[in-house]
Amino acid sequence: MSRSAIQVAKAATYLPDLVEVQRSSFKWFLDKGLIEELDNFSPITDYTGKLELHFIGAEYKLKRPRHDVEEAKRRDATFASQMYVTCRLVNKETGEIKEQEVFIGELPLMTERGTFIINGAERVIVNQIVRSPGVYFKDEQDKNGRRTYNASVIPNRGAWLKFETDKNDLLHVRVDKTRKINAHVLMRAMGLSDNDVIDKLRHPEFYKKSIDAANEEGISSEDQALLELYKKLRPGEPPSVSGGQQLLQTRFFDPKRYDLGRVGRYKINKKLRLTIPDNLRTLTNEDVLSTLDYLINLELDVGGATLDDIDHLGNRRVRSVGELLQNQVRVGLNRLERIIKERMTVGETDSLTPAQLVNPKPLVAAIKEFFGSSQLSQFMDQTNPLAELTHKRRISALGPGGLTRERAGFAVRDIHPSHYGRLCPIETPEGPNAGLINSLATHARVNEYGFIETPFWKVENGRLIKEGDPIYLSADLEDECRVAPGDVATNEEGKIMAELVPVRYRQDFETVSPEQVDYVQLSPVQVISVAASLIPFLEHDDANRALMGSNMQRQAVPLLRPERPLVGTGLETQVARDSGMVPISKVNGTVSYVDANAIVVTDDEGNDHTHYLQKYQRSNQDTCLNHRPIVFNGDPVIVGQVLADGSACEGGEIALGQNVLIAYMPWEGYNYEDAILVSERLVKDDLYTSVHIEKYEIEARQTKLGPEEITREIPNVSEENLGNLDEMGIIRIGAYVESGDILVGKVTPKGESDQPPEEKLLRAIFGEKARDVRDNSLRVPSTERGRVVDVRIYTREQGDELPPGANMVVRVYVAQRRKIQVGDKMAGRHGNKGIISRILPREDMPYLPDGTPVDICLNPLGVPSRMNVGQVFELLMGWAASNLDCRVKIVPFDEMYGPEMSNQTVQAYLKEAAKQPGKSWVYNPKDPGKLLLKDGRTGEPFDQPVAVGYAHFLKLVHLVDDKIHARSTGPYSLVTQQPLGGKAQQGGQRLGEMEVWALEAYGAAYTLQELLTVKSDDMQGRNEALNSIVKGKPIPRPGTPESFKVLMRELQSLGLDIGVYTDDGKEVDLMQDVNPRRSTPSRPTYESLGKEYEE
């Protein structure tokens, strides 16, 4: 036990701030990005050139937001600040200058936890990974198997320029994937003479052929070249020299149209070894000539020219919030520029002011569109703190300017050697997005150019130097170094002990002596993402299962009484703290006041800092957000200390599930195929009970016939059903509601047309106007029940912003406690998931030698084929820890402490546990890790010893309550007349192609017929069948399904004369059953078809 897992937890270096990616990017946008855009955008001159409008970007101001974060959530508002910028209008003729502060729009602000609040909902802007601008060299094989090379110059925005060689060794160029142009034609058009070009090239003899080809085509002067260029780029228009000149100028040399960006300029300078200054963001002649030179070197295979790998992380960069927002602001400002120019031309020059010129609408619209409907602006996943944190660290290759799922090949999705320590190789979704959506590794950070860096310790002469901050390297720099893994063994002085060290060098593995090592990885965890790093014994799990494990931790529902894991990895505290779900002390000081709603910390100067707590708020995923204080009055606290537990936290650590006693043994077939057998204790002791808060809302609208009214007086509803409503007709807080109960009473005025004939008759006789309204109340949907925890009323008078046409909106929040039940999904942390198949009484569960019944029985066959052995290690380590009454932290990849370390550590702990008084039965050396269990029903021992222990098990958000669903009569699809699908639409169960095959194979012809006709879309048949069932008559024969008729009509609409005929040659009329009065068939009523049958 000398260097054991205990020390591993100490070695778990503290991670950097995990949401830094979002925060620093937004800070850059406020400090630099926005100013950059405003400056690029001014001055704007009108078409005559006598008026100029300057934006003074550096002096922009943000006003304090109208609502704070909580208020914005409550009012469904956006947490945003108004932007004002100083504008200067210069009249060139009179020399007059007008200066004014102008409102240019609202900018949503980021909250402290890295999210945005848009219309009351928390949203996250996901980081996007795109191809970096720069120059790329590729090779392609033509159909004869000959290699040709090409070079593409890719800007941040603007036209692509692609140089390529062909089989005759001629150089061509394409602009934006148009037709090929001889490369020398472009050179001449750019005003370069033959000698200018030849002097720049290291192997001009290769280029001479292209010059000759250009001369043969009769293009020998700059003017001819420009004409030729214009013809190729704008075919069909009359070419002119000035047109060609302007075309070339705007396409590549105008900073408004063509921009390499800082990154593009940096990458081109680096690849082509140029020294062009950073602020020159357009193409230069030097760029083009160097690219040609490099391409020729590639073709001749000289001069150390290398091809580029576009999937290398040195060639892909991350665009975070700041940059995405900056691009959006640019779009808005470009639209604004057009408007300003028009207004300058139209308006009276003398009386114009900057405020009249600048219209904030286009900019507001662009920003709103980005936050509201961009693919990268996502509704935050708030199921638990880990889900929230991972969502903010997600990196997506999809989105505007990125890839699409369909076009992304295998290479883009694959793990690349440069991902090491930057993107997690494990955490990615299953299915069509696999490999396109990644997660940032734990220690990775994004540098100023948008490339992902990862930290290393420097090694000098075989000695590790751990002084100061570690050194961050981006992927292309790391390729040139020899890097040893983070788990190399070192002695006290930091000297590497091994004679030979495995290193990574230029994306290959080598073994070198310690003196040759340049860097060592910071920590073994730095390769994987936050979610994966919470899995203990991760190194013993197959990657596919580890992937499921890290994805399922994000779906764990916060439980009523969370319990932190017995076996953890040491990162739990940091995850809870950085997720933003727990309140953190802002100062050093002492706690001066604590209650359920607020904690006050008094700092050393005597100032009070109040931290407000969330009580039973609803999260985006309907789970419950709640804070419980964990500090007491008088406690000293330091900056960054956790003051209260959030949901799924205990003691400031993340606690997603419960530690339960698990046995790996089959039990009467109840855990066949990943099913799970659980004990009643989990239900009785509320171990897996969670609180879910559902939101119901109703709006009273203004209709043509008058306003809808929220009231207690509802027609045809008995007084007892109104018992829980207050005098306004809104449910009282604290009431318990079942499905079908009224939450908010609402009546809608109904027109004359809505009345049935008998009502009209009564009206004619008595002449009095009955209260002509119809009940339109908000009721609890089927399968839902719970207690009303909050009611919010929004009206115009209070100044709330309501949707157009609404007079009042009422929101009711209903909370329910859900105990675990058959059909719920549970999972461990190693991708071992299953559905509960049966809940057994405690006394029937198998029990341990000391009489403790186990909580869960899992199938042992779930382990070998899936190769996630980590669960067995966790089980036994948890067993030892619970018997020793301690908790264990084990960082993944513990081999640096010796071979087979996990095994040794677990064994050592189990032996230690068996030494406790009265615990000798805990560990049996003959059968290590197994115990002889007895059957709870008979008391007989089972045949074989069974692996038993404690593991951290989660309840996932896929709850059976949300999925179970039944339909009797419900809505039908309009065209096919088949029942809709899905729970939300009250849908039916789909009888698909394969189910039809099963019935066909069985020969169940009549069952199949009625499933395809009267139970689905034979309109006439289903109404008649309903009629006959109600009246107890025999069910008539099914007719033609509507979908068949639709098919026939579609074929007819193609102009095919197609019909259906009976045996005796009579044509069947497919249109006969459509009632001419009602084009949309209503739900069937008992008499809805006038056809009565002969008795």
Swiss-Prot record:
Gene3D superfamilies: 2.40.50.100, 2.40.50.150, 3.90.1100.10, DNA-directed RNA polymerase, beta subunit, external 1 domain (2.30.150.10), DNA-directed RNA polymerase, subunit 2, domain 6 (2.40.270.10), RNA polymerase alpha subunit dimerisation domain (3.90.1800.10), RNA polymerase Rpb2, domain 2 (3.90.1110.10). The gene is rpoB. Belongs to the RNA polymerase beta chain family. InterPro entries: DNA-dir_RNA_pol_bsu_ext_1_sf (IPR042107), DNA-dir_RNA_pol_bsu_external_1 (IPR019462), DNA-dir_RNA_pol_su2 (IPR015712), DNA-dir_RNAP_su2_dom (IPR007120), DNA-dir_RNAP_su2_hyb_sf (IPR037033), RNA_pol_bsu_bac (IPR010243), RNA_pol_bsu_CS (IPR007121), RNA_pol_bsu_protrusion (IPR007644). DNA-dependent RNA polymerase catalyzes the transcription of DNA into RNA using the four ribonucleoside triphosphates as substrates. One of its GO terms (biological process) is DNA-templated transcription. It holds the Pfam family RNA_pol_Rpb2_45. Keywords: DNA-directed RNA polymerase, Nucleotidyltransferase, Transcription, Transferase. It comes from Prochlorococcus marinus (strain NATL1A). Its EC number is 2.7.7.6. It catalyses: RNA(n) + a ribonucleoside 5'-triphosphate = RNA(n+1) + diphosphate. GO terms for molecular function: DNA binding; DNA-directed RNA polymerase activity; ribonucleoside binding. It is an enzyme of class 2 (transferase). Residues 1069-1095 are annotated as: Disordered. One of its GO terms (cellular component) is DNA-directed RNA polymerase complex. This is DNA-directed RNA polymerase subunit beta. In cyanobacteria the RNAP catalytic core is composed of 2 alpha, 1 beta, 1 beta', 1 gamma and 1 omega subunit. When a sigma factor is associated with the core the holoenzyme is formed, which can initiate transcription. It comes from the Bacteria.
